[in-house]
Every structure is written in C-alpha cells, then in structure tokens.
C-alpha cells in the first residue's frame, strides 16, 4: 500500500491470530510513527524467542532450558499428570492458580479430517512417561470440541492399564470451547470438579 517494505510488515503481522488487514496496518503505522525503538525491541524479542525458546523434553511445553521451570519445581505433585493439547492450555491452567501437579503437552489433538493422527502427537511419549514414571492420576484436560473429546477417549484407552485413575476435567466448559480462552474461575472450577 505505502511501500513494498511496509506491505511486507503488514503481511507478517497478519499471521498473528485475530489480526486482520486493518489491525496489521495500524500496528505497522504505530511502530513506524516515532516508536521505532519499540519496534526494534519487539523485533529483538521475537528473534530471541524464535531461536532460544525450545520444547521441554519432559512435558513438551515451552522452555528456555531442556527442562521447564514447572518440571523442575520440587513443590509440584508428581502423582498427578494433567494432559493438555498445547502450551497455551498450560498457561491457562496455571493462571487459574488451583492446580499443583505436573503437565504433559500433546502438541495438538486428533483430527482425521486434517490428517492429524496419533503418530503426529506426543501420545507415544505420554505412554512411555507413565510407564517409566508412574502417576496415580491422569487428568485429561483437552478441549471440549469433537476433536478434543476424541483425543481424550483415545488417550484414556492408551494409558488406562498404566495409571490408577484417569479423569476428565469437569463439564461446564462450553462445548466447542478452547481452554486458553476460558476465564480463570471457570477453569479452576472445572479442574476441582473433575469426574
């Protein structure tokens, strides 16, 4: 629109969720209109994040090191493992401030229509995890979408013989809802009232 470089900046900003053409243009103009220091700081933070944030080799969430701060925290309850779809779900549960166990991030959910099957997720690693480091309970905290429900059922069957108890977070979360978009109170209650 203005220049080729400006158009490229707008195009790159549009890859962010919820950012359309107009919002991307406003963001670009905001950064270029006397806030170039903020733009440079943003670019540097993005560069560092893209190169230095890695996947925790234990839970598969994001980490600055091989093992994330949650996995190395000795105050966490090793007997309970909460299985979620994404690192965003870990953040949502942590912000609800009611869960003190460990996590395991699947890396998505089963979706045959999109060509995503069990081999594309961290399900084998989850089964190996509960075989080598047994837990008393697995909490299945996948989304309440059809794909999330299917994933929860598949995991329950895969781990049932290796775990004392497999539970699902309580219903009451809106059908079709994504965990990362729930308010903290709803998510906290769902974890406390799991069945």
Curated annotation (Swiss-Prot):
Presence of keyword Metal-binding: yes
Gene Ontology molecular function terms on file: DNA binding; zinc ion binding
Keyword DNA damage applies: yes
UniProt KW keywords: DNA damage, DNA recombination, DNA repair, Metal-binding, Zinc, Zinc-finger
Entry-linked SUPFAM superfamilies: Recombination protein RecR
Domain Toprim intervals: 79-174
Zn finger (C4-type) location: 56-71
Gene Ontology BP terms: DNA recombination; DNA repair
NCBIfam families the record matches: recR (TIGR00615)
Family designation: Belongs to the RecR family.
Its job: May play a role in DNA repair. It seems to be involved in an RecBC-independent recombinational process of DNA repair. It may act with RecF and RecO.
UniProt name for this protein: Recombination protein RecR
Provenance organism: Psychrobacter sp. (strain PRwf-1)
Encoding gene per record: recR
């Amino acid at each position: 629109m203005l220049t080729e470089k400006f158009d490229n900046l707008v195009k790159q900003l549009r890859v962010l969720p919820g950012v359309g053409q107009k919002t991307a243009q406003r963001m670009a103009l905001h950064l270029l209109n006397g806030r170039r220091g903020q733009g440079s700081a943003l670019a540097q933070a993005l560069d560092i994040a893209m190169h230095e944030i890695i996947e925790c080799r234990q839970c598969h969430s994001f980490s600055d090191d091989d093992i994330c701060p949650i996995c190395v925290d000795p105050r966490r309850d090793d007997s309970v493992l909460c299985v979620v779809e994404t690192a965003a779900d870990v953040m949502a549960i942590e912000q609800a401030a009611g869960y003190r166990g460990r996590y395991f991030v699947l890396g998505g959910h089963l979706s045959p229509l999109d060509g995503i099957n069990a081999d594309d997720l961290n399900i084998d690693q989850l089964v190996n995890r509960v075989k080598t480091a047994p837990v008393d309970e697995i909490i299945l905290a996948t989304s309440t979408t059809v794909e999330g429900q299917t994933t929860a059922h598949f995991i329950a069957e895969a781990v049932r013989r290796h775990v004392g108890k497999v539970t699902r977070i309580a219903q009451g979360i809106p059908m079709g809802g994504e965990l990362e978009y729930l308010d903290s109170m709803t998510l906290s209650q769902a974890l406390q009232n799991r069945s």
